[in-house]
Amino acid sequence: MVWLEPPLLLPIFFLASHVGAAVDLTLLADLRLTEPQRFFLTCVSGEAGAGRGSDAWGPPLLLEKDDRIVRTPRPWQPPHIARNGSSRVTVRGFSQPSDLVGVFSCVGGGGTRVLYVHNSPGAHLLPDKVTHTVNKGDTAVLSARVRKEKQTDVIWKSNGSYFYTLDRHEAQDGQFLLQLPNVQPSSSGIYSATYLEASPLGSAFFRLIVRGCEAGRWGQDCTKECPGCLHGGVCHDQDGECVCPPGFTGTRCEQACREGRFGQSCQEQCPGTSGCRGLTFCLPDPYGCSCGSGWRGSQCQEACAPGRFGADCHLQCQCQNGGTCDRFSGCVCPSGWHGMHCEKSDRIPQILDMVSELEFNLDTMPRINCAAAGNPFPVRGSMELRKPDGTVLLSTKAIVEPDRTTAEFEVPRLALGDSGLWECRVSTSGGQDSRRFRINVKVPPVPLTAPRLLAKQSRQLVVSPLVSFSGDGPIASVRLHYRPQDSTMAWSTIVVDPSENVTLMNLRPKTGYSVRVQLSRPGEGGEGAWGPPTLMTTDCPEPLLKPWLEGWHVEGPDRLRVSWSLPPVPGPLVGDGFLLRLWDGARGQERRENVSSPQARTALLTGLTPGTYYQLDVRLYHCTLLGPASPAARVLLPPSGPPAPRHLHAQALSDSEIQLMWQRPEAAAGPISKYIVEVQVAGGSGDPLWMDVDRPEETSTIVRGLNASTRYLFRVRASVQGPGDWSNVVEQSTLGNGLQIEGPVQEIHAAEEGLDQQLVLAVVGSVSATCLTILAALLTLACIRKSCLHRRRTFTYQSGSGEETILQFSSGTLTLTRRPKPQPEPLNYPVLEWEDITFEDLIGEGNFGQVIRAMIKKDGLKMNAAIKMLKEYASENDHRDFAGELEVLCKLGHHPNIINLLGACENRGYLYIAIEYAPYGNLLDFLRKSRVLETDPAFAREHGTASTLSSRQLLRFASDAANGMQYLSEKQFIHRDLAARNVLVGENLASKIADFGLSRGEEVYVKKTMGRLPVRWMAIESLNYSVYTTKSDVWSFGVLLWEIVSLGGTPYCGMTCAELYEKLPQAYRMEQPRNCDDEVYELMRQCWRDRPYERPPFAQIALQLGRMLEARKAYVNMSLFENFTYAGIDATAEEA
């Protein structure tokens, strides 16, 4: 039950129910039960789909009590509302008699409102008749009967305001009369008669309905003639249809329902066994309220007097030719006679079973049948069909049956002007009869806008077919036609649901497709013309080949040469080049190298960091699409070596020996493992010879096996974990007999066999030492990795309450052991088995984490999911925030506007969190991709729009986010990083709050640690004092709303963070976007108020945005108005 407050406007009483008389809506009041607890009101709709509550069918049935005129105390206990199916709602269980006095209404489809006025049975004055329906210009007389006389004057009010006063001596036969001459539609409303100084509950309440035309007329200018409604039916002043009283039906209310039935098709039945006794029926205006057929009296419990029938027993039978009067249906004629008064003989022809209304589509040529009986029997030439303009159509065929003749008329192609009342006439020697019926010519729907492209892949297009259209509904089917651009091949067609996005499958890559929508309504010829075309282009074909790394080698301290290969493939290679990725896990840095030639199989990477372990992979790319990555390899770039040895000099000892001497390098980073000596013949063309000095404490060596009388060049370098810089080059000649032989040292053999053996031993020793060094390094790395794995299974983090917490994973639980407390607190989470996760594509990654799309199996069902995981070298702080996010997700529970937890899995000491997969990515990128003036200017100018998203869709994003934040605030969680980048777009374009890594579960959170801050989204108190509350999130929501309206613009674009710190406390705020409605901008300003307690709560924000959605107003203007420009984007500023 809805109670309308006094401040609302009054004209709803006499205007709202004029929305459409054709609506089958009835409000019943049970007057048999005088106790408030047993009294009930029932609202019944006979419309198809009534009360389903969707956009297609309108709002659900609603029962309201209006206290704006008859103000009564609020009930101490609200009445009970019960719904029986989708087309009936009942309210009962009122607390006290005063709860019943006043105006009740039933609101149905299309906003049609039916009113009922209830008078107190114990009032001083009672109305002789509650509802009065009169014509424009008539004189209305309202009669208040005295039940309990008072010696005071009587005040008449109209719509709660003083209208007239009658002296107490002006009563006539115990009645006070109010005459209203020459009434107009503005005279309609609620009237009341009250003794002076008496309680309003003792008043007599009336409802006056004034038709907009004079008697027998209807239409905007009241020039059309009413059809002549029978049995007390009232002609609607707007569309000329008869509003039939309860118990009668038909175009002119000519047919009586069976006893106890009502509704436009007699489909409803009165409750109980006593028929419709004691029930008041209220119908759409201009009918009003009355008793059911066969009953009269203030409580509708008195049967009609003999000779009377119908609603309120207003009709007289006046039966002829032996007919008898039935108080429910009128005259019951004997055999051989028919008509309202049994005045027509059966010899007179009679139209049989003629429907009251038909509907056809424009430009169709339907066949209409008309059946008649009589004596003599009607033949084809005796029947004709008349159009509204008077044109006469003759039947083309007649089917004669024992009890009737059915004539078939072929109607020429229908035009809009053919809508109206048609008439079937039959004429024989026994007389004539006619029956009028209405034909409605409907215009097939035609789309006004083209479908919208939401996402694209190489072989798929995601399309939103929801379009505005001209013509008539309802929409029976939506067809999507598409084919390649400039193609002569046949169109492909699929039937789609207009409320859901559709994916066009099996398309050709990098191909433009023309896409059009066709709408259809029910009936033959209901297919409308195709809507305007739009061009949608598929993405490039994704590369499918997976490269593999052939090898790599270090070419310098910061240079790495990488080579790879591809599997053989027939035909041309699909790809534009290769992307090499080097991931430095220790520093959280990624290096990407683009090789622009698809024929390249090697690349030199420079500028690397010595002494770093890199994870290396390579993948093929085509356009913007990446192929599968090669198996990753772990590459160590040796650390930079020590400085060069000092003061190198050489001395010839013999014709085959030279001694080298040097000093240790200065500030070597670690113990020197060996020295490396380079020997080369001066001026020779051969490669140099290297030899190792494996005893690092020695700073001299003798080079043997040299050629006599030959000049040599020498240099030395030291090695710690890798070789260092070379020393200066020195030159020295061996002793000899004057002969000088040039050539590679490796090609000259020493004369003495012992010297050769010493050189071989030196080389073997050097190789052995190197192998031992590599083995020791591998063992050390294995120990370090084992230690890291152990550390990741159990570690500590600082929780939101400030307590140091130990996290331990086990099957299905995350144990948070807070050190000040002796007992652990296990946090349960839905368990996913490692075998039930199939990893697919990398969605995104940051410095320390990755998000991978995966297919998971949960409760026996396969579903898409996004798997969040930390990288191998994430810090303990990262593990802390990651586990904290799982804790937040577990405590939050499920809500349609947040990214919900699907489960978690622990494998080999690593935690994997599975959350809902959002197929359209984050809201920021989604908004920026919709800037169609930048991506497709021709489309934008052709359709006059700046975005592929409508105003309603943008407002829906904001409403969804507000609902999600309301849920977080009710759970007492503070997000702290609310922005469009942290809102994801899920199925049906629903926005979902995401990224709870910074969320906290306190009412106030004070940040005590350092870290990068989202300054442009932060509230003043957060910037100045590092204090975060739900009201701080409200500030951020205002910035998010600005991002949505600006299609992903950068907040405060062009300003530095330092300027923000200075200007925000000085009341500076972002300006109103030109495409933004004042109401939306005012909501932003409310979120940006200086004092947190003055900002609206999320519940109020969600309610306000919900009302904007229901208003269906373009709050965000996406039209290309003059000098339209998008809000600026500064990616570097968004990082701060």
UniProtKB/Swiss-Prot annotation:
Instruction: Please give the Gene Ontology molecular function terms for this protein.
Output: ATP binding; transmembrane receptor protein tyrosine kinase activity
- Active site feature: 977 (proton acceptor)
Highest rank taxon of the organism: Eukaryota
By which gene is this protein encoded? Answer: TIE1
Cited SMART domains: EGF (SM00181), FN3 (SM00060), IG (SM00409), TyrKc (SM00219)
- The identity of this protein, by name, is Tyrosine-protein kinase receptor Tie-1
What are the record's GO terms for cellular component? plasma membrane; receptor complex
Location of the Protein kinase domain: 837-1116
In the UniProt record, does the keyword Kinase occur? Answer: yes
User: Membrane spanning segments where?
Assistant: 758-782
State which tissues express it. Specifically expressed in developing vascular endothelial cells.
Q: How is it modified after translation?
A: Phosphorylated on tyrosine residues in response to ANGPT1, most likely by TEK/TIE2.
Task: Please give the residue positions where the record annotates the modification Phosphotyrosine.
Answer: 1005
Q: List the disulfide bonds.
A: 226-235, 229-242, 244-253, 317-325, 319-331, 333-342
What positions does the entry give for ATP binding?
Answer: 843-851, 868
Member of which family? Belongs to the protein kinase superfamily. Tyr protein kinase family. Tie subfamily.
Q: Which organism is it from?
A: Bos taurus (Bovine)
- Where found, per UniProt? Cell membrane
